[in-house]
Amino acid sequence: MKLHELKPAEGSRKVRNRVGRGTSSGNGKTSGRGQKGQKARSGVGLRPGFEGGQTPLFRRLPKRGFTNINAKEYTLVNLDQLNVFEDGTEVTPVVLKEAGIIRAEKSGVKVLGNGELTKKLTVKAAKFSKSAEAAITAKGGSIEVI
């Protein structure tokens, strides 16, 4: 094979579709816009949810609920994720972040009881579920609310 014989892989380079270049091109005359109407004109920009002047669905339905601006969002960690640490390790949010188990701390870390804990650990977090608390203490570990 020589350099002048190189060809791109089949289907890797798509030919640009040139519209309005004669009827035999398949996209002449109306250029793929159909017949007359708002969407056939230039400069058309219908916003999402526009229903042609009919009251849109989001306005027909009633408002419901609210967003609590004081709500706290905790980063969730399950027990089986803590098995990566050695026995006797003190697990804090900083240690969890360094280990790549959590990305951001948000309002703190909450430990949940999903999975099985196999190590004896000292876990420091903002909140614990009852099942997580029981599992950690059952393995001889301890918890501390920070």
Curated annotation (Swiss-Prot):
User: Where do the record's region annotations for Disordered lie?
Assistant: 1-57
* Gene3D superfamilies on file: 3.100.10.10
Molecular-function annotations in GO: rRNA binding; structural constituent of ribosome
Gly residues bias locations: 23-35
List, as start-end ranges, the regions of compositional bias called Basic and acidic residues. 1-13
InterPro entries according to UniProt: Ribosomal_uL15, Ribosomal_uL15/eL18, Ribosomal_uL15/eL18_sf, Ribosomal_uL15_bac-type, Ribosomal_uL15_CS
Keyword S-adenosyl-L-methionine found = no
GO biological process terms held by the UniProt record: translation
Q: Does the keyword Magnesium apply?
A: no
What is the annotated role of this protein in its UniProt record? Binds to the 23S rRNA.
Q: What is this protein called?
A: Large ribosomal subunit protein uL15
SUBUNIT field: Part of the 50S ribosomal subunit.
Q: Which PROSITE patterns match?
A: RIBOSOMAL_L15
The family annotation for this protein states:
Belongs to the universal ribosomal protein uL15 family.
GO CC annotation, single = cytosolic large ribosomal subunit
Q: Which UniProt keywords apply?
A: Ribonucleoprotein, Ribosomal protein, RNA-binding, rRNA-binding
Native organism: Streptococcus thermophilus (strain ATCC BAA-491 / LMD-9)
Tell me the domain of life: Bacteria
